[in-house]
Amino acid sequence: MSKKKANAPTSNTIALNKKAKHEYHIEERFEAGLALLGWEVKSLRAGKAQLVDAYVLLKDGEAWLLGSHITPLNTASTHVIADPTRTRKLLLHAKEIAKIVGQVNQAGYTCIPLALYWKKNKVKCEIALVKGKKLFDKRATEKERDWNRQKQRIMREANT
């Protein structure tokens, strides 16, 4: 019998792109694998990743993750030069890449990463086809969110 680790993390999420839901309308989501180096996996286990200004570049039938930042650990290997903003390859099926390329070539669509997470012992990246929000759209979603919060508050007070 194997024992479970006492300090096992409860969440599989490594990093979230919180700005994405505010800046874009999310149309469709995809799960992509990530080609990483050893020091990057160690850093991700420590939770040292950011997706703030990251985006997906589609080139020659391949998908690449640009702008993501994985901070190297101090204990990382000395014989490998660690580049925190290295371009990383996304692993997708050819049909998925073709679908994304077709949508991105339409006006207004782009592809961005939403989250990095663990699935079994592999790092996965959730990417999405998105359309940019206008300023009035952002205001409308903010008003809707506030109204939903206020409704919840009123319902809670009415039930007590």
Swiss-Prot record:
Keywords, comma-separated and alphabetical: Cytoplasm, RNA-binding
Record GO biological process: trans-translation
Keyword Thylakoid: no
UniProt-annotated location(s): Cytoplasm
A single Gene Ontology CC term: cytosol
InterPro entries tied to this protein: SmpB (IPR023620), SsrA-bd_prot (IPR000037), SsrA-bd_prot_CS (IPR020081)
Position of the signal peptide: none
Pfam families tied to this protein: SmpB (PF01668)
Disulfide bonds: none
Source species, domain of life: Bacteria
NCBIfam families hit by this protein: PRK05422.1 (NF003843), smpB (TIGR00086)
Function recorded in the entry: Required for rescue of stalled ribosomes mediated by trans-translation. Binds to transfer-messenger RNA (tmRNA), required for stable association of tmRNA with ribosomes. tmRNA and SmpB together mimic tRNA shape, replacing the anticodon stem-loop with SmpB. tmRNA is encoded by the ssrA gene; the 2 termini fold to resemble tRNA(Ala) and it encodes a 'tag peptide', a short internal open reading frame. During trans-translation Ala-aminoacylated tmRNA acts like a tRNA, entering the A-site of stalled ribosomes, displacing the stalled mRNA.
Family affiliation: Belongs to the SmpB family.
Name of the featured protein: SsrA-binding protein
UniProt organism field: Marinobacter nauticus (strain ATCC 700491 / DSM 11845 / VT8)
